[in-house]
Amino acid sequence: GLGDVYKRQNHRRFASAFGSMQTHPAYPTVEGFPEITILENDEENPSKIEEWHTDMTFKKNPPLGSILIGKIIPENGGDTMFSSLSKAYDDLSQEWKERLEEMNAIHSFEFGFKESLEEEGGRERLADALKENPPVSHPVIKQHPVTGRKVIYVNRLFTSHIEEDDSKNSILSFLFEHIHQEKFQYRFSWENNSIAFWDNRSV
């Protein structure tokens, strides 16, 4: 109805205040609002992104942030967990900080969406997304453009390997375990129409 359209217009208007919006290449969108992605997680449409991740790092210029509105909330569970990549960096030893400073990691759409691509018709459905999103390289250690704090910029879902690491991804495995420590985490519990806005450059 008109009420829903108005809410979506406000969603888009709010997001546009922080910069240009990006469309997601793999998920369905709201009719008339290509920037608004539909995320479902139920028995008919189970989530395929249960891994820790930073949104859309397979892009050369990933989005600044993501704004999610909770529309249908389960009675139990469904919380969203965030992990601070700046706190994780601060907790590294000086030796690790220096070692990682010169490293770069490959982030890949194909790697992150391998489950969807393996589904019947998946590779055909996502053919354009695959073509438009070849693997990209990002520094393992990035500096936040606003706060100046350094972050560990790798994630389980999209980071396939570190370019300079030939030890069977042992460095990447170490970083994943390090980042996901409970002391760096924040738990967000949803209610109907809750809004979560997070900084993709640091979580």
Which stretches of residues belong to each language-model region?
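Active-site environment of non-heme Fe oxygenases that use a 2-His-1-carboxylate facial triad
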Residues: 27-185, 197, 201-203
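Glycine-rich loop at the start of a catalytic domain that most often binds anionic cofactors/ligands
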Residues: 9-21
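Glycine-rich, N-terminal phosphate-binding loop and its surrounding beta-alpha-beta segment
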Residues: 24
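Short, small-residue-biased leader/transition segments that mark boundaries at the very start
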Residues: 2-6
